[in-house]
């Protein structure tokens, strides 16, 4: 008897030409139900309806269609097992050779904000059962769960009997498909009902095999959600992104987006932001009245470290900005858009990776961040909650001036993205010195203050953590710093406040720490 394919798909892309070739080239009979059967019949493809095949009607509003011994027996039966052969004959089962199933669009349903009841109805039961049955019996049954697999299956079939290794690969992809589906459902229930899960489960498809990891001897893979975030970015030029590129791009964009997207129809003075980043630390940042000026201001902070760095913008890149960018060696430039003339200028630098990532391509605010440790995983809320200035306290006799308040706010936002211990010196809405990743706070302050030098006069200082002693304030005074912003919370806060008062320095305490490791 000719082979039998069970076809039940929510995503009907390519299903008609695929089934047509199954019938015409390989003499398959098609077994189907519901919307898939209707779709194939309308395309003049002969279909055996599941209800006729099982002699059982669909019940419970379509909740039960394929959950039947004639379906699962035909899929799970081992062709060479004598006991199975007897059961097949005794129960009048017909063997199913190919299962083509993809599932109700649960993720899409919940992303659209559907009601609880509607989302529940989009939890597929029969589909995963058929997929798992076929994957378990992959020695005898092939299983396809995605339209992207159809063409390869046809090509492999033309070669003759399918190889065991190929069928095992299909089974692997099938189990990953159902695992991903179950993960989406469990995470949705946890989120919707505010329930704490006893297991941390996430599912990300493979995006790309990277050339190597942080170092050439380390293997690296890129997993991610499709059509969102960096996976959806349009790369306009340059080699494939590396592991380090992706880490730096993420940090650069996260930093520049502290100032929001400067959309073309919403541009106002001081909304243009640019950040230059190297080795996961900002080495320059600014907001100004144009993208070009913001970049030049950021570059002034540390032009040496900017060499080979990443540049991020929160606004369109025009030709003037591109002219300034082309004079320095950079790994990547990312922005929400580029003028045509700007692209022509930038593309002269053949090795420059140019990425376009617009506001609507960003994921919703991340819920958690993770770090692997030996034998486990640390999970925390991401540090992306908005800092509310209403909770900030001016704790010194002198209050910051209006300009100083602007600079304190700016420096605080940048400091959040600098590795701890972090100190940022800023003036006129641009960084002039950054001290990153030091084991003590005064050491980070020395680096930042020395980098800024004479520019420190009337500048502001931001610290990601509190001052355990007054030594950082004393050092800041020597360089002419006039205002400081820090979380507070030290047992010796008063010592630092007293030092500020004695030197005429303003101090603002935010009551929120921004460590970054």
From Swiss-Prot:
Keyword tags: Hydrolase, Multifunctional enzyme, Purine biosynthesis, Transferase
One GO process term, biological-process aspect: 'de novo' IMP biosynthetic process
Molecular function terms, GO-annotated: IMP cyclohydrolase activity; phosphoribosylaminoimidazolecarboxamide formyltransferase activity
GO-annotated cellular components: cytosol
Keyword ATP-binding tagged: no
Documented EC number(s): 2.1.2.3, 3.5.4.10
Domain MGS-like, first and last residues per copy: 1-145
PROSITE patterns: MGS (PS51855)
Pathway participation: Purine metabolism; IMP biosynthesis via de novo pathway; 5-formamido-1-(5-phospho-D-ribosyl)imidazole-4-carboxamide from 5-amino-1-(5-phospho-D-ribosyl)imidazole-4-carboxamide (10-formyl THF route): step 1/1; Purine metabolism; IMP biosynthesis via de novo pathway; IMP from 5-formamido-1-(5-phospho-D-ribosyl)imidazole-4-carboxamide: step 1/1
InterPro entries: AICAR_Tfase_dup_dom_sf (IPR024051), Cytidine_deaminase-like (IPR016193), MGS-like_dom (IPR011607), MGS-like_dom_sf (IPR036914), PurH-like (IPR002695)
Reactions catalysed according to its record: (6R)-10-formyltetrahydrofolate + 5-amino-1-(5-phospho-beta-D-ribosyl)imidazole-4-carboxamide = 5-formamido-1-(5-phospho-D-ribosyl)imidazole-4-carboxamide + (6S)-5,6,7,8-tetrahydrofolate; IMP + H2O = 5-formamido-1-(5-phospho-D-ribosyl)imidazole-4-carboxamide
The keyword Protein transport is annotated on this UniProt entry: no
Record remark on domains: The IMP cyclohydrolase activity resides in the N-terminal region.
Family designation: Belongs to the PurH family.
HAMAP family to which the protein is assigned, alphabetical: PurH
UniProt-recorded name of the protein: Bifunctional purine biosynthesis protein PurH
Lineage: Bacteria, Bacillati, Cyanobacteriota, Cyanophyceae, Synechococcales
Gene: purH
């Amino acid at each position: 008897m000719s082979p039998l394919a069970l076809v039940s798909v929510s995503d009907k892309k390519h299903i008609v030409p695929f089934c047509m070739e199954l019938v015409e080239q390989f003499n398959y009979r098609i077994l189907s139900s519901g919307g898939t059967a209707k779709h194939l019949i309308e395309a003049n493809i002969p279909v055996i309806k599941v209800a006729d095949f099982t002699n059982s009607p669909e019940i419970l509003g379509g909740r039960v269609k394929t959950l039947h011994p004639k379906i699962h027996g035909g899929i799970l039966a081992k062709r060479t097992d004598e006991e199975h052969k007897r059961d097949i004959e005794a129960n009048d089962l017909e063997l199913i050779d190919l299962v083509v199933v993809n599932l109700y669009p649960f993720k899409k349903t919940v992303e659209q904000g559907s009601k609880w009841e509607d989302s529940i109805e989009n939890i597929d039961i029969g589909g995963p059962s058929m997929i798992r049955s076929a994957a378990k019996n992959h020695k005898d049954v092939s299983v396809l769960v995605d339209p992207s697999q159809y063409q390869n299956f046809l090509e492999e079939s033309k070669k003759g009997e399918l190889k065991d290794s190929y069928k095992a690969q299909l089974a692997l992809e099938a189990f990953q498909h159902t695992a991903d589906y179950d993960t989406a459902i469990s995470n949705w229930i946890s989120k919707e009902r505010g329930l704490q899960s006893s297991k941390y489960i996430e599912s990300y498809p493979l995006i790309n095999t990277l050339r190597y990891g942080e170092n050439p001897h380390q293997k690296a893979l890129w997993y991610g959600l499709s059509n969102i975030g960096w996976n959806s970015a349009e790369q306009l030029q340059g080699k494939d992104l590396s592991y380090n590129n992706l880490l730096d791009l993420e940090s650069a964009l996260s930093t520049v987006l502290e100032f929001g997207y400067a959309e073309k129809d919403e541009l106002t003075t001081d909304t243009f932001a640019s950040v230059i980043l190297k080795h996961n630390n900002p080495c320059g940042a600014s907001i100004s009245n144009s993208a070009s000026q913001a970049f030049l201001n950021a570059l002034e902070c540390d032009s040496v470290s900017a060499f080979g760095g990443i540049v991020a913008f929160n606004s369109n890149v025009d030709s003037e900005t591109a002219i300034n960018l082309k004079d320095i060696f950079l790994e990547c430039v990312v922005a929400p858009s580029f003028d045509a003339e700007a692209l022509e200028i930038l593309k002269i630098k053949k090795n420059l990776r140019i990425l376009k990532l617009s506001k609507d391509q960003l994921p919703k605010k991340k819920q958690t961040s993770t770090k692997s440790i030996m034998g486990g995983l640390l999970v925390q809320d991401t540090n992306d909650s908005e800092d509310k200035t209403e909770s900030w306290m001016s704790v010194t006799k002198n209050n910051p001036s209006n300009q100083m308040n602007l600079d304190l706010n700016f420096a605080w936002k940048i400091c959040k993205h600098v590795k701890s211990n972090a100190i940022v010196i800023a003036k006129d809405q641009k960084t002039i010195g950054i001290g990153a990743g030091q084991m003590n706070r005064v050491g980070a302050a020395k680096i930042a203050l020395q980098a800024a030098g004479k520019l420190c006069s009337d500048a502001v200082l931001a610290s990601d953590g509190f001052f355990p002693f007054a030594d950082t304030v004393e050092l800041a005074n020597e360089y002419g710093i006039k205002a400081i912003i820090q979380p507070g919370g030290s047992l010796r806060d008063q010592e630092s406040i007293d030092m500020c008062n004695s030197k005429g320095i303003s101090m603002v305490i935010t009551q929120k720490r921004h460590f970054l490791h």
